[in-house]
């Protein structure tokens, strides 16, 4: 069975990229068996959010001898930023307090930011002193291989936070390093209506944000309108709204692929049955063929 595909920067991606998420009782030991069953249904690209996912892909690639089998690894941009020589994650609570106090409307931060234990906030001078950390970022990239993961998700929650702090220059530097290592970057964020306009100048192949038929941050209608007009490719994270749309997956994909013109989706699967349901729904949709140059 051949999945419909999309082409980004000359490389093919399936329009559905499984994120293997076994139930807690099975844990990481069930990643490989479930990945293998999805592969046997036709999946040839997997979301790889952890070292155990990458290990499972390596094992499957070795045993199947399938050179076309690939994954999408994740690099957290926090690994590329430091403050006063210390990793930025040590100042996470201070960043949250800073964003909460003035960089986003209070009605939004209440719902999307974790609680902060810090009464302190960054001054503008301190924000300006957040620096790119080449050794840590290069070390993070060294765990990945462009042959296994030609595309690389980069951003995560610290990507949103750096954009909120006005430090897109750090993201530009990290994108350049990712490309220098031979990867094709895909920027991933959590706050769709905030991230897409702010991150638009980045030299990335696509943008990945949580959006589905039920919700998106900060507002589904605004996010939908923005994506419809967005000039660059968008990938849907959490396309089934935490599994609540599984039994109406064809409609969920139709909303994304037909209405919003989203190029691909990354649904989570916890069982072979879920994978089968999604494969059957996906086959109703075509590949995206780039226009022929004249």
Across the structure, where does each feature detected by a protein language model lie?
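N-terminal binding-site loop/beta-alpha segment at the start of enzyme catalytic domains
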Residues: 1-69, 255, 259
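Active-site beta->alpha loop and helix N-cap motifs at the rims of alpha/beta catalytic domains
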Residues: 65-165
């Amino acid at each position: 069975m051949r999945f419909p595909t999309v082409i980004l920067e000359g490389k093919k991606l399936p329009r559905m990229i499984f994120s293997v998420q076994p139930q807690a009782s099975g844990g990481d030991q069930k990643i490989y068996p479930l990945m293998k069953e999805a592969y046997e249904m036709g999946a040839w690209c997997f979301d790889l959010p952890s070292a155990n996912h990458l290990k499972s892909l390596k094992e499957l690639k070795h045993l199947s001898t399938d050179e076309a089998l690939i994954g999408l690894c994740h690099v957290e941009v926090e690994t590329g930023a430091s403050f006063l020589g210390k990793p930025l994650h040590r100042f996470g609570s201070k960043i949250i307090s800073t964003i909460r106090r003035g960089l986003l409307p209070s009605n939004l931060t209440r719902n999307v930011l974790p609680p902060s234990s810090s009464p302190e906030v960054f001054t503008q001078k301190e924000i300006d002193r957040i620096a790119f950390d080449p050794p840590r970022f290069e070390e993070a990239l060294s765990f990945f291989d462009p042959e296994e993961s030609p595309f690389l998700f980069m951003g995560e929650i610290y990507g949103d936070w750096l954009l909120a702090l006005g430090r897109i220059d750090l993201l530009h530097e990290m994108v350049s390093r990712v490309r220098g290592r031979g990867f094709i970057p895909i920027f991933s964020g959590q706050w769709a209506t905030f991230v897409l306009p702010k991150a638009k100048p980045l030299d990335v192949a696509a943008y990945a944000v949580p959006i589905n038929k039920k919700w998106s941050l900060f507002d589904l209608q605004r996010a939908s309108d923005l994506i419809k007009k967005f000039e660059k490719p968008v990938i849907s994270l959490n396309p089934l709204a935490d599994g609540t749309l599984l039994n109406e997956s064809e409609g969920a994909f139709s909303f994304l692929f037909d209405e919003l013109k989203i190029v691909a989706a990354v649904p989570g699967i916890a069982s072979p049955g879920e994978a089968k349901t999604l494969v059957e729904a996906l086959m109703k949709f075509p590949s995206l063929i780039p226009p022929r140059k004249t």
